[in-house]
């Protein structure tokens, strides 16, 4: 099997959609020899910030000299970036080789009466198999959707569970209240385990604490009160903070927005907890500093161009939109802002627009390359409630070119 054939096989599993449950992934992994059982996993769930926290944790551990797997989704540029070891994407040849093996196992499953695995189940199985082959020391594992019945939650043990910011998203699948969504996220907490928790609403905290009580797990709420931000602009942020009674001065991150400072502190808390577990022999402050500053997470308030400044961000729910709006307000207040936007129909479009659009003078709508995308003309009609200067361009390339052609060097896109 060639790499292109492997991708085609994976894409065919798309037709099985999203199916939450652990029976299928469990059988597939059993046929692969249960590779996940060999791994030391930091398991991260939540609505916003999962990938950033996983990336911070992964980079700090690498700076400590460990071999670290990083599993995230979706991908931004190339499929192989979903499965990384020490910053390197899984090689295409390994994708082809492992998918060929997985295909054989799936045929056995189906003959035994099991359903075809979904795309996410197939890719998750491949990740576990690859990390086990690579004999990684740790895996920073990002939940795909929810937690309780997510394919990543087939693991029976983790070093620590982490729950980042929780807000309303995927309400059709996870539930339409913070309490219901928090319950799904808290599903990653293990019996007698430990969970590190981002600052949450009281409703979310109560649910997570209740799950911890039921599972005899330890609940640790990360404190974000003692933070002194010394510098914050579109290029980097410098801050002092105290994490688990240890003070750090002049930490620097390249990720933008106050929420990313909180995400970095959550990552430091994970590292310090692992040290307390005697899982880290060679952790030091310099490793933490280097890991933080070397963390890049594309598509999160990321500046990709100057003159005009061009920023890309993946905000697609209310909390994500608030974080983006806050960062724009802080860095570009009073400047002329242009928004190029495309969204999926199943997102909370109205809430996102209501939060973001007061910051923009001009808007270009486009249609993402996704079967769930909202048509750019329909999106334009929604935007017109807030902004007068709105243009619809169906093709993304046309939309980008039009945006650049109609902007001056002083504009912010």
Residue ranges of predicted features:
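Short functional linear segments
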Residues: 1-46, 53-66, 71, 107-114
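ATP-dependent carboxylate-amine ligase catalytic core
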Residues: 29-30, 34-37, 63-156, 172-174
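Nucleotide phosphate-binding/pyrophosphate-handling subdomain across enzymes
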Residues: 38, 138-141, 149-162, 166-170, ...
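Hydrophobic alpha-helical packing residues
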Residues: 57-62, 131, 356, 383
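Beta-strand->loop->alpha-helix junctions that form or flank phosphate-binding loops
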Residues: 74, 198-199, 213-233, 252-258, ...
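Acidic, Mg2+-coordinating active-site environments of NTP-dependent enzymes
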Residues: 110-112, 134-142, 158-250, 264, ...
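Glycine-rich phosphate-binding loop signature in dinucleotide/nucleotide-binding domains
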Residues: 131-137, 330-335, 403-412
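C-terminal helical cap/extension that packs against the catalytic core
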Residues: 201-210, 216, 220, 235, ...
């Amino acid at each position: 099997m060639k790499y292109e054939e492997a991708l085609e096989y994976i894409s065919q599993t798309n037709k099985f959609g999203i199916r939450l449950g652990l029976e299928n992934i469990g059988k597939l992994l059993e046929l692969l020899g249960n590779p996940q059982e060999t791994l030391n996993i930091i398991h991260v769930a939540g609505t916003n910030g999962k990938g950033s926290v996983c990336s911070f944790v992964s980079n700090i551990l690498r700076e400590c000299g460990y071999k670290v797997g990083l599993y995230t989704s979706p991908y931004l540029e190339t499929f192989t970036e979903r499965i990384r070891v020490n910053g390197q994407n899984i090689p295409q040849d390994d994708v082809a080789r492992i998918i060929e093996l997985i295909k054989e196992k799936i045929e056995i499953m189906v003959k035994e009466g099991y359903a075809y695995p979904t795309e996410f189940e197939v890719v998750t199985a491949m990740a576990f198999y690859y990390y086990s082959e690579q004999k990684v020391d740790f895996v920073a594992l990002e939940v795909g959707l929810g937690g309780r019945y997510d394919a990543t939650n087939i693991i029976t043990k983790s070093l620590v569970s982490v729950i980042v910011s929780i807000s309303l998203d995927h309400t059709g699948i996870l539930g339409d209240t913070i309490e219901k969504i928090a319950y799904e996220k808290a599903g990653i907490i293990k019996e007698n385990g430990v969970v590190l928790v981002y600052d949450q609403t009281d409703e979310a905290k109560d649910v997570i604490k209740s799950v911890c009580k039921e599972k005899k797990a330890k609940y640790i709420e990360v404190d974000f009160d003692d933070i002194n931000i010394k510098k914050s602009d579109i290029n980097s942020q410098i801050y002092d903070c105290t994490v688990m009674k240890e003070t750090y001065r002049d930490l620097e991150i390249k990720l933008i927005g106050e929420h990313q400072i909180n995400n970095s502190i959550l990552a430091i808390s994970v590292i310090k907890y692992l040290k307390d577990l005697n899982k880290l022999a060679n952790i030091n402050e310099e490793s933490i500093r280097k890991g933080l500053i070397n963390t890049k997470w594309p598509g999160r308030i990321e500046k990709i161009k100057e003159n005009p400044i061009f920023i890309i961000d993946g905000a697609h729910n209310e909390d994500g939109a608030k974080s983006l709006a806050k960062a724009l307000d802080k860095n570009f207040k009073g400047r002329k802002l242009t928004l190029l936007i495309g969204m999926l129909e199943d997102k909370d479009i109205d809430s996102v627009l209501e939060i973001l659009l007061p910051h923009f003078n001009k808007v270009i709508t486009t249609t993402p390359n996704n079967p769930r995308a909202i048509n750019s003309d329909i999106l334009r009609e929604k935007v017109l409630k807030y902004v007068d200067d709105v243009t619809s361009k169906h093709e993304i390339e046309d939309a980008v070119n039009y945006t650049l052609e109609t902007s001056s060097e002083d504009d912010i896109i």
